[in-house]
Amino acid sequence: MGREPRSARPSRITVVNRTQARLDAMRAIHAQLNSETQVEYVANSDPRVNDDLLSGLAPNSLVINATGMGKDTPGSPVTDAGVFPRGSYAWELNYRGELGFLRQALAQRKERRLHVHDGWRYFLHGWFTVIEEVFDVRIDEEKFSRLAAISDLERPPGPR
C-alpha cells in the first residue's frame, strides 16, 4: 500500500466487516504501513448498505467477498439488487457453499463487463502448497493441472 508509484496504487480502499474489533485490528496493521492510500473502515452487516457502498465504487474496482457468507453462513454481503461497477473485478474467496456473491457477479458479468474470479483455484493452490510442505514433494505446473482436474470432478456443485 505504499511502495508502488502513486499511479499504480488504489485511490481508496473500503473495508467492510460485521465486527468492529476486526476493523480495528486491520486499521492497526494499515497504520504500520505509513501509506497515503485512504482507507475507509465500515462496520456493517446489512447487505443493503453494502449495495450502496458498491454503487459508490469507481469503474474497474476490485470487489472481494472474504466474509464467509455463502460458505460459513447463508447469503451474500450484497443483495441481488446490488450493481457491480462497470469493468470491475469480482473475487469470490469462498470455494464451497451456496456462493451467492459469485452467482451475483456471474449474472452481471456480460452486461457490466466484469472479471469474475472464483475462489476454488486459490483454495487448490493453498492445499497443494501444504501437500508440498508436508510430503516434501514438488508440484510443478503439469502436476498442478492434473491434480486440479481430479479435484474439479469432486467439487461441490454451484455457480461457475
Model region roles, listed by residue range:
Residues 1, 23-26, 101-105:
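Hydrophobic packing residues within well-ordered alpha-helices of enzyme cores
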Residues 2-12, 35, 108-115:
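Conserved S-adenosyl-L-methionine
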Residues 7-37, 44:
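NAD(P)-binding Rossmann-fold cofactor-contacting core
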Residues 10-12, 59-60, 85-87, 113:
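A general structural motif
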Residues 13-16, 62, 88-95:
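Alpha-helical membrane segments in multi-pass integral membrane proteins
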Residues 15, 19-22, 40-78:
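Rossmann-like NAD(P)-binding element
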Residues 70-146:
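Rossmann-fold NAD(P)-binding glycine/threonine-rich loop
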Residues 141-160:
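A short, charged, Gly/Pro-tolerant segment at domain boundaries
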